[in-house]
Amino acid sequence: MLKIERLLINFKTLEEFKRFKEYGMQELSMLEDLQDNIIENDSTSPFYGIYFGDKLVARMSLYQVNGGTNPYFDQRQDFLELWKLEVLPGYQNNGYGKALVDFAKSFRMPIRTNSRMKSADFWDKMNFEPVKYDMARDKGENPYIWHPDMDGEMTSGETA
């Protein structure tokens, strides 16, 4: 079983994020996000990752969003924004991305994400649904959503 860790906001994590920037697309870069929030060992980090040995090989950011401004789910409820999921080349197709998504699902809250870089098939496999595009709301993004009721694989209280 893979262990998902909340990433500390510190200079070590900053160095690890630089590895992702070498491989990833600019839109997936979290380096600037981390630099803007750097407080040594901040425990309220929105960043989560998976290590293989001592090397960070997969990561995402996960934010809780106030449902009062929620245009994606029927009951204006709080939801999670799953952002910038990325797995380093050489570690892809080993279940790391799925493990991060399952971790986010374990909070049993609706989730919104943005499909990038030909990742629609991945989100479909994770039981996310594409949202009908609305130019004013989505502003060039390709939102996908998941609600706990959409996924029969996990039961209430079960964690990934």
UniProtKB/Swiss-Prot annotation:
The keyword DNA-binding does not apply. It is an enzyme of class 2 (transferase). The keyword Amino-acid biosynthesis does not apply. Pfam families: Acetyltransf_1. GO terms for molecular function: acyltransferase activity, transferring groups other than amino-acyl groups. SUPFAM superfamilies: Acyl-CoA N-acyltransferases (Nat) (SSF55729). Its EC number is 2.3.1.-. InterPro entries: Acyl_CoA_acyltransferase, GNAT_dom, YlbP. Keywords: Acyltransferase, Transferase. Residues 7-151 form the N-acetyltransferase domain. Transmembrane segments: none annotated. Gene3D superfamilies: 3.40.630.30. This is Uncharacterized N-acetyltransferase RBAM_014960. It comes from Bacillus velezensis (strain DSM 23117 / BGSC 10A6 / LMG 26770 / FZB42).
